[in-house]
């Protein structure tokens, strides 16, 4: 009896971990003119209020995580600069 309860609780715990995954929201923009590219952030630490630094075709922006996959977190790195990006 106790092993069945333990198995059910373990299954519920694993299920809640899987369901609680968070992602950057999918961008509705598929392309952007280079002159409109801007980075508001390069890493999550640049964002406030629990938002993440997410990559879009028009640059990196702070977005609140969602439970739907499809978006992409900004890679950051030394070459990332905030502000308008000029090529």
UniProtKB/Swiss-Prot annotation:
GO terms for biological process: defense response to bacterium. Expressed by the venom gland. InterPro entries: Elafin-like_sf. Contains 5 disulfide bonds. GO terms for molecular function: toxin activity. It is found in: Secreted. Disulfide bonds join 24-54, 32-58, 41-53, 42-80, 47-62. Residues 21-66 form the WAP domain. GO terms for cellular component: extracellular region. Residues 1-20 form the signal peptide. Keywords: Antibiotic, Antimicrobial, Disulfide bond, Secreted, Signal, Toxin. Belongs to the venom protein 11 family. 01 (wap-1) subfamily. Has antibacterial activity. This is U15-lycotoxin-Ls1h.
